[in-house]
């Protein structure tokens, strides 16, 4: 039975929550902020302090506690810096332009321990030539320490590609690698541009979703027919939402809800509505009810695109470093596409051709090949294949990453022990965990008899394949670079971004 005290406590809580919400409403703060773990900690600490808490002043928020948070973030940053010299570092870079056409370039450092935000540069007044991009990247490498950096990952734009070549010419022991997520997204873009069936079908899919989502009544009807499922793929379980993968994810969701959509447009509700009389409504109905043209084309598009979406999700995952997997996963994606089209060559050969053009010219890199060779997940499989490209990639990595010729010879000799599963490599636990442990952890456990090879392998297999971590959390920059904050001194602005971005990265671990 509810007591009087419980009734009063509920009312007190409602009053407190109402005041918290009023603060959020009057400052136009996103409702989603209540899901931030820091929000829960704040509420708990206020409750623990009890009556009489004096709120922080404007000066304390702007000066005192910001400085403390910068120091706290720097301490966290130092923990990551220790990891830089132990394993492999990837410098990740990406650019962003806000609504006012201000350009920001940011730089992150990734290791197996996690990713940290290092710096951002306002490039609005800088011509982004290959030379300038090279100079910015070179300065960042100097800050991190060339001896700690294995690769620099950026997007595939021509100026970044040329800057990467300049970088590898100056810094003889590291690699420039194009972002795998960006490469795969460009493959999907090529599908849409070069394959008429894809272009037309995607456009029709967009028309359907735009039409329904811009009409509240239709959206309400659709919810009844699809029983609470989502029409647009935007849930965390879905693959990465890149610019061009979104189009195929939308087609996938339309396909999942094909029956519900057809039922809705065949229903009495639709037939008796005002929408059916308008030209747009008639046009959308024609598309949805086209079971011989539109829907088979949707299925065909997905047969070609979804295997690549799987690779996209893998390389963008924070779960494990993807370097040891992308080489084989791209081959598996092509095999899956072939299987989806029942091995009929004329049905998939143009898709394969588009993939190969990007893969061979942009994504196929020495690090990818070396990591494939060194990955125990694949190396001992009956399907493992070592062609000339894989061997060239492996030995190119050895030449660049291991400057001492004597050490390279040692590693080359130790590779034979790995290939033949001799010593620790062949014990039962090593065999049983080849596909269960991450490649880096496996080498850490069983590579002690080959110390030089072990260090080399862990550095390669612990690498990320993408700079997509850079593309997240641009909202941190959006929030700082606004009218309301334009009186902040540049250093405070930098401090605020440094704290916000690294806290957001920490949340994701």
Description of each model-found segment:
Residues 1-509:
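Short alpha-helical patches at protein termini and domain edges
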């Amino acid at each position: 039975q509810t007591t009087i005290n419980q009734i009063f406590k509920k009312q007190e809580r409602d009053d407190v929550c109402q005041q918290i919400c009023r603060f959020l409403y009057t400052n136009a703060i996103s409702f989603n902020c209540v899901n931030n773990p820091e929000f829960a900690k704040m509420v708990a600490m206020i409750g623990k302090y009890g009556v009489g808490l004096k709120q922080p002043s404007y000066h304390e928020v702007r000066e005192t506690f910001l400085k403390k948070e910068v120091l706290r973030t720097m301490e966290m940053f130092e923990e990551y810096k220790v990891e830089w010299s132990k394993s492999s570092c990837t410098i990740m870079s990406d650019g962003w332009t806000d609504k006012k056409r201000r350009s920001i370039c940011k730089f992150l450092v990734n290791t197996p321990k996690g990713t940290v935000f290092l710096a951002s540069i306002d490039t609005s007044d800088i011509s982004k030539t290959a030379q300038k991009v090279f100079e910015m990247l070179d300065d960042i490498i100097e800050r991190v320490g060339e001896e700690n950096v294995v690769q620099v990952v950026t997007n595939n734009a021509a100026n970044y590609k040329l800057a990467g070549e300049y970088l590898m010419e100056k810094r003889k022991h590291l690699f420039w690698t194009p972002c795998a997520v960006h490469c795969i997204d460009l493959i999907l873009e090529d599908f849409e541009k070069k394959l008429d069936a894809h272009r037309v079908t995607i456009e029709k899919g967009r028309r359907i979703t735009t039409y329904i989502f811009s009409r509240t009544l239709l959206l309400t009807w659709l919810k009844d027919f699809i029983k609470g499922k989502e029409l647009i793929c935007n849930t965390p379980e879905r693959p990465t939402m890149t610019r061009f993968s979104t189009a195929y994810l939308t087609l996938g969701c339309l396909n999942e809800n094909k029956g519900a959509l057809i039922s809705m447009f065949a229903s009495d509700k639709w037939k008796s509505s005002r929408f059916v009389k308008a030209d747009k409504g008639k046009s959308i109905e024609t598309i949805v009810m086209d079971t011989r043209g539109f829907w088979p084309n949707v299925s065909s598009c997905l047969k070609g695109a979804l295997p690549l979406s799987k690779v996209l999700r893998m390389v963008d995952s924070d779960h494990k470093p993807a370097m040891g997997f992308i080489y084989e996963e791209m081959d598996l994606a092509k095999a899956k596409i072939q299987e989806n089209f029942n091995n009929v060559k004329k049905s998939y050969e143009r898709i394969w051709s588009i993939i190969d053009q990007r893969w061979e010219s942009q994504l196929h890199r020495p690090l990818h090949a070396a990591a494939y060779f060194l990955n125990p997940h694949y190396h001992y499989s009956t399907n493992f294949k070592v062609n000339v490209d894989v061997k060239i990639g492996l030995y190119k990595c050895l030449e660049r990453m291991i400057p001492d010729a004597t050490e390279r010879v040692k590693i080359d000799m130790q590779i034979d022990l790995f290939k033949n599963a001799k010593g620790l490599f062949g014990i039962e636990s090593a065999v049983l965990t080849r596909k269960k442990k991450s490649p880096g952890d496996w080498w850490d456990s069983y590579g002690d008899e080959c110390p030089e090879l072990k260090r080399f392998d862990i550095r390669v297999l612990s690498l990320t394949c993408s700079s997509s971590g850079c593309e997240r959390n641009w909202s941190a920059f959006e929030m700082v670079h606004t009218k309301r904050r334009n009186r902040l001194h540049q250093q405070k602005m930098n401090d605020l971004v440094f704290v916000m971005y690294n806290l957001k990265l920490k949340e994701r671990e």
